[in-house]
């Protein structure tokens, strides 16, 4: 579960390394976000020469969470890190590559471009 002030790794090649959640989108009193949710983030650290600059406010979709997520078949999925992929206002990824595995729940939330770029869907 991700909430305000949570720090997350960036799993794409936009140049951002780490972001901090500043808002969970989808309701005025919504506090937590999980895999497949869109959040608003502030970029905290970047790779030199990247297209995304430090302190930029960006949108991102959550692709991995440490908190175990229950699936309809009764199984649970858990990752080693909290990670996001930066997206634009139309929910298309800003980068051209995605590193690491992504959760299958992204397919249900119509993030097909992210699912197709990922090398592993768990």
Swiss-Prot record:
One MF term in the entry's GO annotations: structural constituent of ribosome
Gene3D superfamilies named in the record? Ribosomal protein L14
Q: Which cellular component terms (GO) are annotated to the entry?
A: cytosolic large ribosomal subunit
Decide whether keyword Magnesium is in the record: no
Give the InterPro entries listed for this entry. Answer: Ribosomal_uL14 (IPR000218), Ribosomal_uL14_bac-type (IPR005745), Ribosomal_uL14_CS (IPR019972), Ribosomal_uL14_sf (IPR036853)
- Superkingdom of this protein's organism: Bacteria
Q: What biological processes does GO assign it?
A: translation
List the coiled-coil residues.
none
Q: Which UniProt keywords apply?
A: Ribonucleoprotein, Ribosomal protein, RNA-binding, rRNA-binding
Q: Known Pfam families for this protein?
A: Ribosomal_L14
Per the entry, what this protein does is: Binds to 23S rRNA. Forms part of two intersubunit bridges in the 70S ribosome.
Q: Which family does it belong to?
A: Belongs to the universal ribosomal protein uL14 family.
Q: How does it assemble?
A: Part of the 50S ribosomal subunit. Forms a cluster with proteins L3 and L19. In the 70S ribosome, L14 and L19 interact and together make contacts with the 16S rRNA in bridges B5 and B8.
Q: Check the record and name the HAMAP family matching this protein.
A: Ribosomal_uL14
Its recorded name reads Large ribosomal subunit protein uL14
What is the species of this protein? Rhodopirellula baltica (strain DSM 10527 / NCIMB 13988 / SH1)
């Amino acid at each position: 579960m991700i909430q305000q002030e949570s720090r997350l790794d960036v799993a794409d090649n936009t140049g951002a390394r780490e972001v901090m959640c500043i808002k969970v989108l989808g309701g005025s009193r919504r506090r937590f976000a999980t895999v497949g949710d869109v959040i608003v983030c502030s970029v905290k650290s970047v790779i030199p020469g990247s297209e995304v600059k430090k302190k930029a406010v960006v949108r991102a979709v959550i692709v991995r969470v440490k908190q175990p997520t229950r699936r309809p078949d009764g199984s649970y999925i858990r990752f080693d890190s909290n990670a996001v992929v930066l997206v634009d206002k139309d929910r298309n990824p800003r980068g051209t590559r995605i590193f690491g595995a992504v959760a299958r729940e992204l397919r249900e939330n119509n993030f097909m471009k992210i699912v197709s770029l990922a090398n592993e869907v768990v």
